[in-house]
Amino acid sequence: MPVITRFAPSPTGFLHIGGARTALFNWLYAKHTGGKMLLRIEDTDRERSTEAAVKAIIDGLHWMGLSYDGDPISQFERAERHRQVAEQLVKDGKAYYCYASPEELAEIRENARAEGRPPRYDGRWRERDISKAPKDIKPVIRIKAPQDGETIVHDRVQGDVRFPNKDLDDFIILRSDGSPTYMHAVVVDDHDMGVTHIIRGDDHLTNAARQTIIFNAMGWDIPVMAHIPLIHGENGAKLSKRHGALGVAAYRKMGYLPAALRNYLVRLGWSHGDDELMSIEDMISWFDIDDINKGAARFDLKKLDAINGHYIRMSNNQDLFDAALHILKEIEGGLQIMERLDEQRRAQFLKAIPNLKERSKTLCELIDNASFIFTKRPLQLDEKAQTLLDKNGLAILKVIYLALKACPSWDVKSLDETLRSYAQTQDLKFGSIAQPLRAALTGRLTSPGVFDVLVLLGRDESLNRINDQLVTTACSLHTNQCI
């Protein structure tokens, strides 16, 4: 039998990082076994489900390169099928109509609280004759859960997990308005979709026990279950926004590459020996649900940064350039950069990529490191650069300006010879002239090599930027060293 997995998100928000990992595990296992992964949108909560959320989920999957087979399946659109199965269970004596009033249910809950017990429905309509049912109550349908013994969930990750049946009670499968509960709809859909393997978070383990009861009541085969550990923050607590609980779209906007995020997520709860960096082909070849760990994984943003930095360094220059341009419209200040990216600056940006990617962990860092290319003149110096262009720094810069202006050829070799010759004649270390020059050219003390920057910007732009600082910075220091 071919393996069929499913990713079944609720469209009440974005595709969060935990959901992305669940989708990845389902996708990898389907690919590993030559099977299929289906997408089911669990949109029965009509008040909270939105089309925007559905789009965000699908966009997130596409961005991560996680394709699904066939069209997305709407759980809401299958409500009639869910109702039919619930009524069939009643006919088969496996479920029953419950006419308990809201007041009765409130009394059951209150009595349980008073006695220190968990609130459980007491089964009062389990064997009662419905001909005596009150006319003013619309019934729900409840499953006839086993009252003795235990329900065992056979799980490929967690092992056999046992649930005393006395703790599960006769839960509702169809509400009084005819709509199915989540517990019931999931079972019917998994059966009808031919799902063979359910891979999801271990917060669904209790649900698995109740769903097992429904599968057994219908006489259906129970899919193989694999409940994967949740992702915790670096502090070991439940993942919060502060520690990484963001949507996939947020990581895209933060400049992470989909290949890097896949590589990072696959190792949260699963591993293949000491292998840390894996191609997608390796992941498909190696992934198996039997190798998933039981313990919660911890989200480490520094580790993600390191992996993303590796993928950036290994990326094709043109692909990286295109990816950087693509996120400009989504990041702060990106639209202003796009307005200034004329043909010349685009060419300069692309030319700088080989150098920039060596010092960037994200696309946003890469764009920021390239900001000297598209910034407006005169450049605004950051605080560290300002400290270098004091009176002494400006004096050095003035002589550098004159030396560069006289440089016969504007290439790395000629520029190197010109500046190093000047440093030697003045008995200066090269760094003492390179840093003021870097500050004038880029507004910062960190950038690609100063000769690379000079060549990238060209003679006119480089000299103009140096002159800008001689004029503006010198005048701000109340000197007359302007050229």
Curated annotation (Swiss-Prot):
UniProt-listed Gene3D superfamilies: 1.10.10.350, HUPs
**Where does it reside?**
Cytoplasm
Q: Where does ATP bind?
A: 241
Tell me a GO biological process for this protein. glutamyl-tRNA aminoacylation
Motif span ('KMSKS' region)?
Answer: 238-242
Report the top EC class in one word.
Answer: ligase
Q: Which reaction does it catalyse?
A: tRNA(Glu) + L-glutamate + ATP = L-glutamyl-tRNA(Glu) + AMP + diphosphate
InterPro entries, alphabetized: aa-tRNA-synth_I_cd-bd (IPR045462), aa-tRNA-synth_I_codon-bd_sub2 (IPR020751), aa-tRNA-synth_I_CS (IPR001412), aa_tRNA-synth_I_cd-bd_sf (IPR008925), Glu-tRNA-ligase_bac/mito (IPR004527), Glu/Gln-tRNA-synth (IPR000924), Glu/Gln-tRNA-synth_Ib_cat-dom (IPR020058), GluQ/Sye (IPR049940)
Write down the SUPFAM superfamilies for this protein, in alphabetical order: An anticodon-binding domain of class I aminoacyl-tRNA synthetases, Nucleotidylyl transferase
- What role is this protein assigned? Catalyzes the attachment of glutamate to tRNA(Glu) in a two-step reaction: glutamate is first activated by ATP to form Glu-AMP and then transferred to the acceptor end of tRNA(Glu).
Its family? Belongs to the class-I aminoacyl-tRNA synthetase family. Glutamate--tRNA ligase type 1 subfamily.
Q: Per its record, how is this protein called by name?
A: Glutamate--tRNA ligase 1
Q: Which organism is it from?
A: Bartonella henselae (strain ATCC 49882 / DSM 28221 / CCUG 30454 / Houston 1)
User: What gene makes this protein?
Assistant: gltX1
